[in-house]
């Protein structure tokens, strides 16, 4: 869970983020090797069956968020801050630009699904960039060369443009690789507006919202919602180079924000 060279650097510029090449820290490369080898269709179906009954815990959003102090994301080359520090950074950047409170809340909670790691799942099954499974992998997925060892290579249908899906079927019908995005979406889908839910569900899906891949699987509503994901992304990504947040000072505001949208406890 640690890296010998610090990844967090105050004052980083936008061009300094998301560098995935030979200079990428070994822990990040090793993460994607595992992720791309093991994110199969079979695995994704099993994870949805395991987690989406939401029968693993019942607790408040705030208490869950404080649990994430224990996590530093091995897939992220840009920060070695705790997860709660990153969540606070993101929410504060959104707030500073005057966006609605639901937008701020999306920033505050967008990574809470990473609690799956604290509950026993390996990081390769929790964090990192996401992508559709059950169809051909885009070469624009970071470290796409690692897919060569994925067992789904041997399933011809999965190696076609649409795979097990149909043209313009809509992303609701597409399995995106399992991780914290998909899990948290199902936890909070009854409490937040569709735009916030799209930010949560697809913020790690860089092949779609950054690279413009898989548009042939999207419907008109997906294209509308993806614009909100793109609005959210700079806050998630570029706030990592800013000053560390004062968690104690921000706590009253953030607790009030959570209480505005969520009951005292929800199912996880």
Where are these regions (language model features)?
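Non-catalytic interface/linker regions that flank or bridge core catalytic/transmembrane domains
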Residues: 1-60, 70, 268
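Charged, low-complexity, helix/coiled-coil-prone segments
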Residues: 23-54, 119-135, 143-147, 167-168, ...
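Residues that form generic nucleotide/phosphate-binding pockets
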Residues: 30-34, 50-51, 64-71, 93, ...
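Alpha-helix initiation and N-capping motif
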Residues: 44, 58-65, 193, 222-225, ...
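Active-site flanking loop/helix segments enriched in acidic
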Residues: 49-85, 166-171
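Short secondary-structure junctions and interdomain/linker hinges
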Residues: 71-75, 207, 236-239, 264-268
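Divalent metal-dependent catalytic cores for phosphoryl transfer on phosphate-bearing substrates
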Residues: 79-249
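Charged phosphate-binding loop/patch that engages nucleotide di/tri-phosphates or the phosphate backbone
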Residues: 252-268
